Regions:
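Class I S-adenosyl-L-methionine-dependent methyltransferase catalytic core
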Residues: 1-184
Length: 184
């Protein structure tokens, strides 16, 4: 795994192989991550990354949020509950020297504390496939999102977004279905 673009382009991130089934890690491949950022930056959404406040739910290794920081996001918050994933996430933040621009929360992504003072403008949602956790996490964090914020959701089947969210695009990359939503 590596950072695909931006200021830290080419930076090698901590290795996890093809994923750790026991730790429920399924990192977004470089190819899919590149496609996601091409879609975000060239899909008619302006540039939702530059200057943005990013929330990476079910963050795993943090590759999506860190990619956003490399491409100009101002801040990234990561939510992860797994011990192995948290260790990799913290290591990757250190490799990027991004400690000052990040916050890491160890908690269940389906439960949200009160919203931060600065609303999130871009949310990455990459839950374990087929468990309905994405729907619950997005509903729990809806109050964190700025009006019109983009949500990029990875699943293996079409997700059911909470009421008020508008689906803008959906693309399949192998087993991964990427859905872009707009917050109300």
């Amino acid at each position: 795994m590596r950072i695909i673009g931006g200021q830290r382009r080419g930076l090698k991130l901590a290795e996890v192989g093809d994923g750790d089934a026991r730790a429920h890690l399924r990192p977004t491949s470089d190819r899919v991550r590149e496609a996601i950022f091409n879609l975000l930056l060239n899909g008619g959404y302006g540039n939702p990354v530059a200057g943005g406040h990013v929330l990476d739910l079910f963050a795993g290794t943090g590759a999506l949020g860190l990619e956003a920081l490399s491409r100009g996001a101002q801040r990234a918050s990561f939510v992860e509950n797994g011990t192995a994933a948290l260790a990799l996430l913290r290591r990757n933040i250190a490799l990027m020297r991004a400690e000052a621009a990040t916050a890491v929360e160890r908690r269940d992504a389906t439960q949200a504390p009160p919203a931060p003072a600065t609303p999130v403008t871009l949310c990455f949602l990459d839950p374990p496939y087929g468990k309905g956790l994405g729907e619950r996490a997005l509903a729990a964090h809806a109050g964190w999102l700025a009006p019109g914020a983009l949500v990029l959701w990875e699943e293996n089947i079409a997700p059911v977004p909470p009421e008020g969210f508008t689906q803008l695009d959906q693309r399949r990359y192998g087993d991964t279905l990427v859905t872009i939503l707009e917050a109300p």
